[in-house]
Regions:
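Short amphipathic alpha-helical segments with coiled-coil-like heptad repeat character
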Residues: 2, 75-76, 168-170
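Bacterial N-terminal signal peptides that target proteins for export
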Residues: 1-7
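Exported/periplasmic cell-wall-interacting domains
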Residues: 22-23, 46, 111-211
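Residue-level signal for mature regions of secreted extracellular proteins and peptides
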Residues: 11-12
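C-terminal motif of bacterial Sec signal peptides marking the signal peptidase cleavage site
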Residues: 15-17
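Cell wall/extracellular polymer interaction/catalysis modules
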Residues: 21-110, 119-133, 193-198, 206
Length: 211
């Protein structure tokens, strides 16, 4: 009798394990799989539909000194960049580009290297931000440059530099993907009036990963 009870108990445990595969040691629970449903008395997982890729995302490979553009998960342009030096490294992590600045003015940040620097107006040839700026982690950003020879090198104080022609094209794409579309007259104006700063906030910030 005791042997029969033991066998029945082991059988019940085995059945219990069979109907609950969604709660294993790897954490593949019902929450991660999606919803749950009951079928024939057993709890089963309903597969979750993967979230779609954002309209646009950026990745920066600091070692390769490259910026990669993705549209809806598909690879687009690969652009050369300058990154921070060993002393002033570019911060890694995941961020969101929330603002595009055309013809940015440069205000020296409150950091040791900029203590004796002076501000540079929009459009000034000595302005280190170039023609456009993508803000993701103030004061650091992706921006143009007045030193195109630095592209492909570790040369900045933490920001990511691009050639002016590249940042202008990328800024337009970021605005469109971020829900801040403008017509061609807007872009003609900001390129023509280089001494006038234009700030555009993005309703849908564009994700960027720096590694």
């Amino acid at each position: 009798m005791q042997t029969r009870s033991l066998i029945l108990g082991l059988t019940a445990l085995a059945l219990s394990a069979c109907v609950r595969p969604i709660d294993d040691e790897k954490g593949d629970t019902a929450a991660s799989a999606g919803a749950t449903a009951t079928q024939g008395g057993a709890v089963v997982a309903v597969p979750q539909v993967p979230a779609s890729d954002p309209a646009m995302r950026l990745e920066v490979d600091l070692a390769a000194r490259k910026l990669y553009v993705f549209h809806h998960g598909h690879a687009g342009d690969t652009l050369s960049v300058a990154v921070g030096t060993t002393e002033w490294p570019t911060k890694t992590g995941s961020f969101r580009i929330s603002q595009v600045v055309w013809n940015p003015e440069w205000v020296p940040p409150e950091e040791a290297w900029a203590k004796d620097e002076k501000p540079e107006a929009s459009g000034d040839p000595d302005n280190p931000l170039g023609q456009a700026q993508l803000v993701y982690d103030p004061p650091r950003s992706i921006h143009g440059t007045n030193e195109p020879a630095s592209i492909g090198k570790a040369a900045s104080h933490g920001s990511i530099r691009m050639r002016n022609e590249d940042i202008v094209r990328l800024a337009r794409e970021v605005m469109e993907a971020g829900g801040a579309q403008r017509d061609s007259s807007f872009f003609s104006q900001v390129r023509r009036n280089r001494s006038t700063k234009q700030v555009v906030d993005l309703p849908n910030p564009v994700p960027i990963t720096i590694r």
